[in-house]
Swiss-Prot record:
Listed Acidic residues bias regions: 1-15
Coarse class of the protein's main subcellular location: nucleus
Protein name in the entry: Zinc-finger homeodomain protein 2
Organism: Oryza sativa subsp. indica
This protein's record includes keyword Cell inner membrane: no
Keywords for the protein's UniProt record, in alphabetical order: DNA-binding, Homeobox, Metal-binding, Nucleus, Transcription, Transcription regulation, Zinc, Zinc-finger
SUPFAM superfamilies: Homeodomain-like (SSF46689)
UniProt site positions, description: Required for DNA-binding: 278
Domain notes: The homeodomain differs form the typical one by having namely 4 instead of 3 extra amino acids inserted in the loop between helix 1 and helix 2.
Subcellular location: Nucleus
Record-linked Pfam families: ZF-HD_dimer (PF04770)
Length: 290
């Protein structure tokens, strides 16, 4: 009976709350180290869960200088100069993951293993390139082998290289020489325009140019397809228009409208045609007249 009462008394006792691990490690068995995710410590004791005590973290690791890039917004690289992680709160609290010196998260600080071999066990709190890029830290090659060039830059560069390779393959398949797409130079005036254009344009440029040249070729061979109409005058009409223009002073004014209308009916020319002829010959025939 005493033994049963003792069991009932033990069942009524309240279990103590489990401390919150600052390193987000999995629950460990007694006698195992905390930094290695279930790997025994060299000393044989019970280790903490990757906390930030004494140099920035337990479990056989220390967190040194801060690597957070504070100039990532302007495309530069600048660190705050914090030399070592110092936890802002007690072990097990959320503040234990924030540095009291620089205010950055512990993951921004360089992790240094304290194991004798120099290679510590893999911890869940190890800094990954994705976490660094998400928090705005610029990867730098001199701090840790985890850091790489930003993924966006590599993707853009690879996209340009792939596009250039595709263009070169298309040019080779079409039988065109692989030459850079460029406009002909205007400094070489001695060469023929066709010679300059033949070796410097690709298939994507030649197609539209051929279409433009075929569409613009008209009956007269000029730039526009529509032929310009030019009025031809007889010598008698020219003589009469010259005499009439000299009488008006090579200017058509409002009070001369009646005379101009009568003259156009006699010579069989339109008013705007007479006006254009006077404008074109004002400085040639007008100056020759005495």
């Amino acid at each position: 009976m005493d033994f049963d009462d003792h069991d009932e008394g033990d069942g009524d006792e309240e279990m103590p709350p489990m401390p919150l691990s600052s390193g987000y490690d999995a629950p460990m068995q007694p006698g195992l180290g905390g930094g290695g995710g279930g790997v025994p410590k060299p000393g044989g004791g019970v280790g903490g869960g990757g906390g930030g005590g004494g140099g920035g973290g337990g479990g056989g690791a220390r967190y040194r200088e801060c690597l957070k890039n504070h100039a990532v917004g302007i495309g530069g690289h600048a660190v705050d100069g914090c030399g070592e992680f110092m936890a802002s709160g007690e072990e097990g609290s959320i503040d234990a993951l924030r540095c009291a010196a620089c205010g950055c998260h512990r993951n921004f600080h360089r992790k240094e293993s304290e194991s004798p071999t120099g290679v510590g066990p893999a911890e869940p709190s190890a800094v990954s390139p994705a976490a660094i890029s998400a928090y705005g830290a610029s990867p730098h090659h001199q701090f840790s082998p985890y850091y790489r060039t930003p993924a966006g830059y590599l993707h853009h560069q690879q996209h340009q290289m792939a596009a250039a390779a595709a263009a070169a393959a298309a040019a080779a398949a079409g039988g065109y020489p692989q030459r850079p797409l460029a406009l002909p130079s205007t400094s070489h005036s001695g060469r023929d325009e066709g010679d300059d254009m033949s070796g410097m344009v690709g298939p994507m440029v030649i197609g539209p140019m051929v279409g433009m040249s075929l569409g613009s070729a008209g009956p007269s061979g000029s730039g526009s397809g529509k032929k310009r109409f030019r009025t031809k005058f007889t010598q008698e009409q020219k003589d009469k228009m010259l005499a009439f223009a000299e009488r008006l002073g090579w200017r058509i004014q409002k009070h001369d409208e009646a005379a101009v209308q009568q003259f156009c009916e006699e010579v069989c020319v339109k008013r705007h045609v007479l006006k254009v002829w006077m404008h074109n010959n004002k400085h040639t025939l007008g100056k020759k007249a005495p």
